[in-house]
Design a protein with these regions (language model features):
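Negatively charged
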Residues: 1-220
Length: 220
């Protein structure tokens, strides 16, 4: 249904229990808002870009079984009306969350309960997601290597992330650039001495007056 801009039919009766990839399934299906709440997604490994730019979509999918999914990159990117609960999702096998909520401009649901311990890429995850302002301090981020642009141009975020373990992250470029509401003390973050990019880390983060992390291998 990707780019099927007029499609908006019910798919509630579909048996998708053997489907392994739903990547880009409704990408740019700009009218779709059909009931898929009850889908059995136990075999799915990829939901990458599933609702990317699906600008009408706002259906509850919080009951889906996502325990086998490894890729959620760009899943709700540009899904500008989506604002449903996802906190009960099992994301323990997900590796890729880059751009997951980029430009998801009204999404502001708690996801602090997620087990993100296997995620390696969170780049651009909440960029331009201006409504999002939830605490994420319970996240175990020890596997993450890329947080570049993670909160870039997010004008609303000031959630608690002070307890994150960032010792494995090597790319923090523009992580908070243009995050004009953010103001947290991140002095306790342990920064990887092998960070390759921290340029523009806090560029135009105009509200941030509390302590930054200490970088030894690059200049912010």
């Amino acid at each position: 249904f990707a780019f099927a801009s007029d499609f908006n039919q019910s798919l509630s009766s579909w048996d998708v229990s053997n489907v392994t990839s739903m990547g880009s399934m409704f990408e740019a299906a700009t009218s779709f808002n059909g009931n898929i709440t009850g889908w059995i997604t136990t075999s799915v490994t990829s939901m990458s870009a599933m609702f990317k730019n699906a600008t009408a979509f706002n259906v509850s999918v919080g009951g889906w079984n996502t325990s086998t999914v490894t890729n959620m990159s760009s899943m709700f990117q540009g899904a500008s009306l989506f604002n449903n609960s996802l906190n009960n999702w099992n994301v323990s096998n997900v590796l890729h969350m880059q751009s997951m909520f980029t430009n998801a401009s009204v999404f502001n649901q708690p996801i602090n309960g997620w087990n993100v311990s296997n995620v390696t890429n969170m780049a651009v995850m909440f960029s331009n997601a201006d409504a999002f302002n939830q605490d994420l301090n319970s996240w175990v981020t020890t596997s993450v290597t890329n947080m570049a642009n993670m909160f870039q141009f997010n004008g609303g975020f000031n959630g608690n992330i002070t307890g994150w373990n960032t010792s494995g992250v090597t790319d923090m470029g523009s992580m908070f650039a243009g995050a004009t509401a953010f103001n947290k003390d991140l002095s306790t973050w342990v920064v990887n001495p092998n960070v390759t990019d921290c340029a523009n880390f806090d560029l135009s983060a105009t509200a941030w007056v509390l302590a930054r992390p200490s970088f030894t291998s690059c200049t912010i």
